[in-house]
Amino acid sequence: MAGNSLVLPIVLWGRKAPTHCISSILLTDDGGTIVTGCHDGQICLWDVSVELEVNPRALLFGHTASITCLSKACASGDKRYTVSASANGEMCLWDVNDGRCIEFTKLACTHTGIQFYQFSVGNQQEGRLLCHGHYPEILVVDATSLEVLYSLVSKISPDWISSMSIIRSQRTQEDTVVALSVTGILKVWIVTSEMSGMQDTEPIFEEESKPIYCQNCQSISFCAFTQRSLLVVCSKYWRVFDAGDYSLLCSGPSENGQTWTGGDFVSADKVIIWTENGQSYIYKLPASCLPASDSFRSDVGKAVENLIPPVQHSLLDQKDKELVICPPVTRFFYGCKEYLHKLLIQGDSSGRLNIWNIADIAEKQEADEGLKMTTCISLQEAFDKLKPCPAGIIDQLSVIPNSNEPLKVTASVYIPAHGRLVCGREDGSIIIVPATQTAIVQLLQGEHMLRRGWPPHRTLRGHRNKVTCLLYPHQVSARYDQRYLISGGVDFSVIIWDIFSGEMKHIFCVHGGEITQLLVPPENCSARVQHCICSVASDHSVGLLSLREKKCIMLASRHLFPIQVIKWRPSDDYLVVGCTDGSVYVWQMDTGALDRCAMGITAVEILNACDEAVPAAVDSLSHPAVNLKQAMTRRSLAALKNMAHHKLQTLATNLLASEASDKGNLPKYSHNSLMVQAIKTNLTDPDIHVLFFDVEALIIQLLTEEASRPNTALISPENLQKASGSSDKGGSFLTGKRAAVLFQQVKETIKENIKEHLLDEEEDEEEARRQSREDSDPEYRASKSKPLTLLEYNLTMDTAKLFMSCLHAWGLNEVLDEVCLDRLGMLKPHCTVSFGLLSRGGHMSLMLPGYNQAAGKLLHAKAEVGRKLPAAEGVGKGTYTVSRAVTTQHLLSIISLANTLMSMTNATFIGDHMKKGPTRPPRPGTPDLSKARDSPPPSSNIVQGQIKQAAAPVVSARSDADHSGSDSASPALPTCFLVNEGWSQLAAMHCVMLPDLLGLERFRPPLLEMLARRWQDRCLEVREAAQALLLAELRRIEQAGRKETIDTWAPYLPQYMDHVISPGVTAEAMQTMAAAPDASGPEAKVQEEEHDLVDDDITAGCLSSVPQMKKISTSYEERRKQATAIVLLGVIGAEFGAEIEPPKLLTRPRSSSQIPEGFGLTSGGSNYSLARHTCKALTYLLLQPPSPKLPPHSTIRRTATDLIGRGFTVWEPYMDVSAVLMGLLELCADAEKQLANITMGLPLSPAADSARSARHALSLIATARPPAFITTIAKEVHRHTALAANTQSQQSIHTTTLARAKGEILRVIEILIEKMPTDVVDLLVEVMDIIMYCLEGSLVKKKGLQECFPAICRFYMVSYYERSHRIAVGARHGSVALYDIRTGKCQTIHGHKGPITAVSFAPDGRYLATYSNTDSHISFWQMNTSLLGSIGMLNSAPQLRCIKTYQVPPVQPASPGSHNALKLARLIWTSNRNVILMAHDGKEHRFMV
């Protein structure tokens, strides 16, 4: 699933909450969210209400090692950004509102603390992150792009910094950074706002360095109340210093030998200090520490022993302590302006949060009396509170008698080709089950709730205890037999299963420990190894097990330490094993001999060499960087487990290498609409299952099926339901005998076509034997029926049903809900569905069950509104009130899918397997074949061809069988219409009506920028949904909102230089301007990903040649913002910038309200530079020659094309119309060829898509401003003909854009004649010039004008005489143009004062009659018919003379305006010398020459 597609995760958590061993805590500034990081690398977001009730909302995945620190990263109120750092140097910037990852980076050092520092530059607020950790300096990082800007360095005894604090000075502009090094030396740096401009310059040295003899410093904090004191907490004592000269004011020892882990000021005279076992003490400071008291600093200079000791004020402790694995984490937070609580928050290893509200400590409280805890909640408690319990993927099949906990799923693998999920459980059994069916049971209400053991499934029993890993090798590589499934367990065994028959083929017992991993060797190994799989066990051994020979061909087992990574060197026949102690063993695969063992740098080099040999280090066990995205692209999802739980460091090169290689190997459109991925947060946890729905793939599959569907009259849902008989208890739903016959027929048909490719003979005989037994023995059938039979269900429709039912906002419109249930066959969810959100680089946030419990009571102004909502109403509406990003994704998905289903015939989910028999004709393929339509294996193009031919016979076989049992009825048309109407209502509700139905205080509107990035999505349905949503949202926010949007995004609009566009600039010059600095380091990574991101290359053209004052940020987000600004401003300008005037009514005054500020051409001195800049950006993107950064058919270029077309009237004053039209013609010159070979259902190729957009833009421009289009093209034609006459340029003339785009130009002219005839007549001579250029002369001579271009012959002022091949055209200014097709010459005659109404040649070609209604004259011209003239010798132009002129009474038009003026009168020759002037009202005037 490429990053570009729209992928939505839905999570099935199961009853056991994920392990969350808390390692760091943060409370957001508004006090509304607690963020906790854990040792496994996940981050949890907890909502906090005003009453301090806490509810876990989401879990964020993305880090691959323990989280070491969290910090806020944004100061503005609406954005709530948090930055996290992990032990292996990763840093992520998260949006706390919705869990999106905004930016991420990886540094070669570990941070242990981050402080956010904000300062203002001019009127702009800038944010910096000051990081310290396992390195001897403080790094200053930009808070938005995560780039390291500069560092604070020590001259004197540099060392690691153990903690740091920023002291804000109210009096001067200088802020100081105070830090303590590990050795107890206090360092002071001065940070001024001038340094904000600094970047990559020389480091800043400290101002002061002073030993204060504080060993093992845990924390240092500055007193915000007095602005004068510093608290330093060390493991055995804590001290207060004067921040002015760092002299000691007071010291406190540790209580009964405990270790302090941190502290902070609670008020001017109290501090709170906490210990590693979770107790916290509040102390009152002596007067000598308080700047306000008279005895301040009275103790300075005394020895530590003689200082006045602080008095213990109170103790905070938990009553009933649980056993914890590691010390809890405690932090103190006090509020900002609007948030007054002082909270002490503690998190421990069981995922529990304890909160004390310290604000209400009474002065008189006795020291021994502890403070009551305010709130206490753990993840597991939050799970347990929910009714119904959070569902696991196969809970209904895992019930244990006399226990309320289902069996835990310990390993899973999904087989997309069959839509089956294989789950290994803790009792050793393995279950194979249809994934969509089992998910429907868990998430939706329906008839399935009444059936036990639904859906039909198969159980494999063979392991004696927990199953630890599963592998379906065929999915990773097509060289493996598609029947084999491999499982490993804690019983040391590896078993080969046949998934079709359910039998155990072989057991390997070669290891002496539980199996931890099963891997597939790379493609280029030796033939023998290619049929092996590699197993890794906890006894530190690695085996190569041959599936073909059913024996272990090599066992490498002398490793002294656990195995961390496995690499391959196929060219040398080596298997390389890396262990946790850093040693590397190199084994020969064929002989099983140990070639060498290496340590240290040699070991690292050996591992790196393997990476070079196999560019994608896919199979490293510990590939932490194998993130979601990669794992999903590879469809080998073993990789994901490592991401979740092997906290091991590998080199970042792996990431880049495998990224690069992935792009090449992936077959196009091999995506599956559904992927199920099991993830664990910790090794000991049961699997959590995430269902990834790929909206684009689902749309493609639905459309492909629709295209291949046979005639509906043959099989209608009604027939199927009548025919299919009653269902029985077994897995097979058709009654025995007929099913067998039918099955046989279907099978024969398919076997003919696919035998060589997919079916195994032996399995067939087995099949027949079983079939006969099933018929005779119902018991046997029930126990042995195949898990999924061919006639049972349609995977694509089931996926769509599950997805649409989860996305729909239930309960807002009861009538529509009824339609959805009864007519469309959707099902209501049991409880709120936990969705997820995928963001950059495969980071994802998953909603925790019950995330909306506290949603109504969040701490915002909306708190009151929230209280009044009834409790039950959360179900269904939840997702549109969560966050703007979630709303955007969900609305895009539901609208694009509803539109797709609406375009299909009778696409209802009713009548599937739960009723009796499927709605759809069966798909070709036996139950055991990978259903070709879902995911053809990369190599199966031939197979696909065979299957397509197989489709028709299969269907007829099926329908005959059905008709034999029922009278055939034609499908009822009304139902089809009603179904489509239902989908249409569903789409309309979500597109337009949601804000009103939900109420604005709860509805989170879609994000304009996310929609803008999909303005030209490659999937047309998603594209249309995004455009409809964006325009609906822009209308909803009205003029004020649009103005605000413009103000927000205008600063990001890149300022392109004007001369870039002028046609005179050579391509080379442009290339040099576009050349970017060499990408190195992190930039290289960004480019590496570029293709795979949400908006593949929308950012490509944007920064190439922008002369900006400030350093161009290479940050992905920066470039993305520029692209987004171009699109958003382009859309607002195009759609709301100006009303396109109907032609001829130019005088109509424009009301000022229609034009957003900055987009009008008003004379009132208004600033319209915005429209100019937007227009420059759009034309730049259209005309910039293709380069690696801006490929010829990129999304951003296509978007520019589209917006230039839509808003042409707004941009026209600022653009070089000629260059733009030529650019568009260039893009669609080969449109016919491109658009001819597209496959129904599949997205267009980029080239075809560009052509389609350019075509559309040309039509829009032409109809919006016909005169501009016609005159510009005519000018180009004249220029071109002049060039052609010049013999030197002859060679290139046929390759020019104009010559290649002749067909397109004619197409547009035809549209204009159809829609805007008045404008065409105004410029008829120019139009004729263009037509004459575009039509082949020889063709016109052969077929005549009427046949070559019939549209132009509609006009009475055009006449063609075939024998002399002449065309006469009457112009607006009273002249007549005569074209001679043979010579290509044109001659003009003047004879009238007003526009010419009609012209006509006499039948023998001697005379030409011309009539003008305005000056009421009809003239007859004698054509020169001398021999020389008619043959056209000497290219002599025919001499014309006017022989007669008659006065005619003028004809009155029927009604003013409209096209009547064009049809006033026509000339009809009755013989060679007689002509009739026929007026539109039927009056005739006869004339004779």
Curated annotation (Swiss-Prot):
Region of interest: Disordered: 754-783, 911-947
Repeat (WD) residue spans along the chain: 17-56, 62-104, 156-199, 324-366, 404-443, 462-507, 558-597, 1350-1389, 1391-1431
Taxonomy of the source species: Eukaryota, Metazoa, Chordata, Craniata, Vertebrata
Pfam families in the cross-refs: WD40 (PF00400), WDR72_alpha-sol (PF23123)
Highest taxon listed in the record's lineage: Eukaryota
Coiled-coil boundaries: none
Key words, A-Z: Phosphoprotein, Repeat, WD repeat
Compositionally biased spans, kind Basic and acidic residues: 767-782
RNA-binding in keyword set: no
GO BP: hematopoietic progenitor cell differentiation
Protein name, UniProt field: WD repeat-containing protein 7
GO CC aspect terms: synaptic vesicle
InterPro entries for the chain: Quinoprotein_ADH-like_sf (IPR011047), WD40/YVTN_repeat-like_dom_sf (IPR015943), WD40_repeat_CS (IPR019775), WD40_repeat_dom_sf (IPR036322), WD40_rpt (IPR001680), WDR7/72 (IPR049916)
Residues modified as Phosphoserine: 935, 1455
